[in-house]
Swiss-Prot record:
Domain of life: Bacteria
InterPro entries listed in its UniProt record: UPF0473 (IPR009711)
HAMAP family cross-referenced by the UniProt entry: UPF0473 (MF_01448)
Membership in a protein family: Belongs to the UPF0473 family.
A UniProt-annotated Pfam family: DUF1292
Protein name (record): UPF0473 protein CHY_0543
Amino acid sequence: MEVGEVITLVDEEQNEFEFAVIDLLEVEGKKYAILVPAVEEDEEELEDEEEAVILRLEMDEDGNEILVDLEDEEWEMVADAWTEKMEDEGSDE
């Protein structure tokens, strides 16, 4: 998985949604993907209050990369780390 890549996630009802990978980071030895809904260039649907989706990257028994949902506490920890990273990168300019 790479930053800028668009991936398709499938929910419990088999609905497909496209997400763009906007960042990858490691927190406490685990890797995470930060995703936002992928929007066509001619669409202006992203709203300011829309949250990023954070999923943990793991390997399945066959060595394939999979994405795993987070519990609320883990989500908060990673969201805080990502916010801090963005603030640090913003202050470097």
